[in-house]
């Protein structure tokens, strides 16, 4: 079926074999390449469609967001266009993160604007709770360790999402990771001060203020800050714990705060974390995602392989000493849908196994059978002197780890030495295509950019021109990228031990959570590179330009620098 995007079309559904709507004569192929297949969601200011990109082999599915201001007022149209261009610029900037949909295209057609994004198959957290029941305390902590690094990344790009809610968090079916969607309400901190017309700027901002109940007071007053996303994340935690929307939770008549604590039973320490996330006053709320993670005193989802970040030798993690949760009171899992169901298809979801395993980190993870999930792999190497299985909670449909029809199995291997751990990590890699420099460059020349999770050990790409490659979580141990062009490359969570980046152009590359032990970055261009939480122990930055790189002094203490190294923020050599 083809679907007409004309908002005034009386019969938008059309057969597959036509290119012009039979009812209104409107073209069914946007920009000459996107064949619209169906409506995913709509609102007063636009609609979202599923489409097939007929210009690419295999006609891959994508998401087309239409912004359709129905007005003759040139000022309103101009503001709508600014909103469209703002979202396009933001998506282009933050879409480099593997858990944010990539922007594929954007264009204007007949006074309507279109954004084309990567299609993410899976269920959102709102659907997950409605189908499978509420989360345990441990599962909500796991959620926080995954969503907070995403927020930390988009905030580092000077972007406030402004619409964090369960409906905008999809658990990707292919790997069970959360993907943050719908940047339609973003507030670009850089561009927000460029408009001299205050009334027009206010009207433009008012188009997309967020979702009532999830947006904090300062955001409703058109003055969002980074901590506004922290508040919305806290409200999302409440929904995961209770199944209740903010409208279903009473407010204190004197303070205006949500009276949520009577609806849940969690440890006092975790309750304090949520309480501070939900502070109405920005002054008393957590200011950043990292502050929340520090308060949780538990490793992030990605930290299983990043324990070498500390200056001490590799050791088994110890527990955080959290009080155990005593249970979760069930909320109404059939609460009405408050969010836009826009960018996803329906997919089958396996029933949830409500059992959970308590590790000595204080994290309780939900488990199912028979394969181990990526979420569980992040914590499976943590030594646990005793493993307790929590009794099944009284959930509406049983429990599950996530959507997508993938089963799981929790394993508890013995702790490894560092060398054994590295060997085991390579042995546990899924079977993937065997790569060498020739096959890699051939695939790149044909348009391939996604090399995530691939086994690229020892690959030689010296002097290669491969900007924009995605090597997220790939194994690149002993690879050679000397003098390569790697602008905007994504090496997030990649294994990069002893990799040669000597003289390479790595400007605006992402190395979040990567293992760069012993890597050679001498003379490399590292302007705008993000090394957040990367392990730089023994990495050589002699003569490298770190002037605008995001890296902490603590990380650099573990690395090698010399007098020719341009240090962060200084603009001058050491």
UniProtKB/Swiss-Prot annotation:
Disulfide bonds: none
MF (Gene Ontology): ATP binding; protein serine kinase activity; protein serine/threonine kinase activity
InterPro entries to which the protein is assigned, alphabetical: 5peptide_repeat (IPR001646), Kinase-like_dom_sf (IPR011009), Prot_kinase_dom (IPR000719), Protein_kinase_ATP_BS (IPR017441), Ser/Thr_kinase_SpkB (IPR016252)
Catalytic activity from the UniProt record: L-seryl-[protein] + ATP = O-phospho-L-seryl-[protein] + ADP + H(+); L-threonyl-[protein] + ATP = O-phospho-L-threonyl-[protein] + ADP + H(+)
Residues in Protein kinase domain copies: 34-301
One Pfam family from the record: Pentapeptide
E.C. numbers: 2.7.11.1
Post-translational modification as stated in the protein's UniProt record: Autophosphorylated.
Swiss-Prot/TrEMBL keywords: ATP-binding, Kinase, Nucleotide-binding, Phosphoprotein, Repeat, Serine/threonine-protein kinase, Transferase
Biased composition (Polar residues): 343-364
Catalytic residues as annotated in Swiss-Prot or TrEMBL: 163 (proton acceptor)
Binding site for ATP: 40-48, 65
Region of interest (Disordered), ranges: 319-407
Signal sequence interval, chain numbering: none
Location of the Pentapeptide repeat domain: 454-493, 504-543
UniProt cross-references to NCBIfam families, sorted A to Z: 4Cys_prefix_kin (NF045510)
Similarity comment: Belongs to the protein kinase superfamily. Ser/Thr protein kinase family.
Protein task: Protein kinase required for cell motility, but not for phototaxis.
PANTHER family from the UniProt entry: SERINE/THREONINE PROTEIN KINASE, SERINE_THREONINE KINASE LIKE DOMAIN CONTAINING 1
Protein name, UniProt field: Serine/threonine-protein kinase B
The gene coding this protein: spkB
């Amino acid at each position: 079926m083809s679907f007409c995007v004309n908002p005034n079309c009386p019969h938008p559904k059309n057969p597959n074999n036509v290119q012009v709507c039979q009812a209104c004569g409107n073209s069914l192929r946007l920009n000459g390449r996107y064949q619209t297949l169906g409506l995913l969601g709509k609102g007063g200011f636009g609609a979202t469609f599923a489409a097939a990109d007929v210009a690419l082999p295999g006609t891959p599915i994508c998401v087309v967001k239409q912004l359709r201001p129905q007005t003759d007022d040139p000022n309103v149209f101009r503001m709508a266009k600014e909103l469209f261009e703002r979202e396009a610029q933001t998506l282009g900037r933050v879409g480099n993160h593997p858990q944010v949909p990539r922007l594929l295209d954007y264009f204007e057609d007949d006074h309507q604007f279109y954004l084309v994004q990567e299609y993410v198959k899976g269920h959102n957290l709102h659907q997950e709770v409605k189908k499978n029941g509420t989360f345990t305390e441990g599962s909500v902590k796991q959620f926080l360790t995954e969503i907070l690094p995403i927020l930390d990344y988009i905030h580092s790009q000077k972007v406030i999402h402004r619409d964090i809610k369960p409906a905008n968090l999809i658990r990707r079916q292919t790997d069970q990771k959360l993907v943050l969607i719908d940047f339609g309400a973003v507030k670009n901190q850089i561009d927000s001060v460029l408009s001299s017309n205050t009334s027009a700027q206010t009207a433009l901002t008012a188009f997309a203020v967020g979702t009532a109940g999830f947006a904090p007071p300062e955001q409703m007053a058109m003055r969002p800050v980074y901590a506004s996303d922290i508040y919305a994340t806290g409200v999302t935690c409440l929904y995961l714990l209770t199944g209740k929307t903010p409208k279903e939770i009473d407010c204190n008549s004197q303070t205006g705060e949500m009276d949520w604590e009577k609806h849940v039973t969690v440890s006092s320490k975790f309750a304090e974390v949520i309480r501070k996330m939900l502070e109405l006053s920005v002054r008393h709320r957590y200011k950043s995602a990292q502050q929340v993670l520090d308060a949780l005193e538990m490793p992030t989802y990605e930290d299983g392989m990043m324990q070498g970040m500390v200056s001490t030798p590799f050791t088994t993690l110890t527990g955080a000493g959290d009080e155990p949760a005593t249970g979760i009171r069930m909320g109404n899992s059939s609460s009405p849908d408050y969010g836009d169901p826009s960018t996803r298809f329906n997919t089958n979801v396996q029933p949830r196994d409500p059992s959970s395993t308590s590790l000595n980190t204080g994290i309780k993870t939900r488990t199912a059978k028979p394969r181990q999930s990526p979420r569980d792999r992040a914590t499976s190497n943590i030594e646990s002197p005793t493993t307790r299985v929590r009794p099944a909670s009284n959930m509406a449909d049983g429990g599950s780890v996530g959507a997508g029809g993938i089963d799981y199995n929790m394993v508890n291997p013995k702790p490894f030495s560092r060398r054994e751990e590295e060997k085991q990590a390579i042995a546990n890699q899924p079977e993937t295509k065997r790569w060498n420099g020739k096959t890699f460059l051939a695939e790149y020349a044909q348009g391939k950019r996604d090399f995530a999770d691939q086994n690229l050990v020892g690959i030689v790409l010296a002097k290669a021109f491969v900007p924009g490659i995605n090597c997220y979580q790939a194994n690149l141990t002993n690879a050679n990228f000397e003098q390569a062009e790697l602008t905007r490359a994504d090496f997030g969570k990649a294994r990069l031990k002893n990799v040669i980046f000597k003289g390479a152009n790595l400007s605006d590359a992402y190395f979040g959570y990567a293992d760069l032990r012993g890597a050679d970055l001498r003379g490399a261009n590292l302007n705008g590179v993000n090394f957040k939480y990367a392990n730089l122990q023994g990495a050589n930055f002699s003569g490298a330009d770190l002037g605008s790189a995001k890296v902490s002094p603590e990380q650099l203490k573990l690395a090698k620098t010399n007098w020719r190294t341009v240090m962060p923020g200084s603009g001058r050599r050491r």
